[in-house]
């Protein structure tokens, strides 16, 4: 059976993904900041690097899949966290685990992005995220002057982060 790493596996969608994979006989690695097999804060570069290092130590032979479910809602009242976890954390883990996925040949990556409704989409921010995804600090500075207690702003940033993630995945996936 396969080896799958799942972010956000201690609750919500991630927990259900782990449950289904384990029922099918697969080995799972729960990556979560609370109670994971690998405990790390994916909203900061040090936490992301910890995950990448531990995945390489645990499974140098490779991964069959990487399923990225970790995220926070627009109502979390921390605009920087929305972007750093939902977008930057996810793409950093994909990039850092890419060589492990390549080793297995038929590996897959799945991201959770439920930004179907794009009525309040900050397309400008989605474009900035996609075109400058190597400059996290500068992008986080752009949102630091916005009102964290404004639910509409939080939701717009959430949708932009998830839409940008979906676009990033499409740009980097095999055709």
Predicted regions and their residues:
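Catalytic loop of short-chain dehydrogenase/reductase
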Residues: 74-76, 106-175
């Amino acid at each position: 059976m396969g080896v799958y790493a799942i972010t956000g596996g201690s609750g919500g969608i991630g927990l259900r993904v782990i449950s289904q994979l384990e029922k099918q006989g697969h080995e799972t690695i729960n990556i979560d900041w609370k109670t994971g097999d690998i405990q790390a804060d994916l909203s900061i570069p040090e936490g992301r690097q910890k995950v990448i290092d531990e995945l390489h130590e645990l499974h140098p032979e490779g991964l069959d899949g990487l399923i990225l479910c970790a995220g926070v809602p627009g109502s979390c009242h921390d605009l920087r966290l929305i972007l750093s976890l939902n977008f930057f954390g996810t793409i950093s883990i994909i990039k850092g685990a890419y060589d492990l996925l390549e080793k297995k040949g038929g590996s897959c990556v799945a991201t959770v992005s439920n930004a179907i409704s794009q009525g309040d989409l900050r397309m400008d921010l989605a474009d900035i995220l996609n075109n400058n995804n190597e400059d996290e600090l500068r992008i986080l500075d752009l949102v630091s002057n916005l009102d964290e207690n404004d639910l509409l702003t939080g939701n717009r940033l959430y949708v932009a982060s998830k839409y940008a993630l979906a676009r990033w995945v499409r740009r980097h996936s095999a055709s």
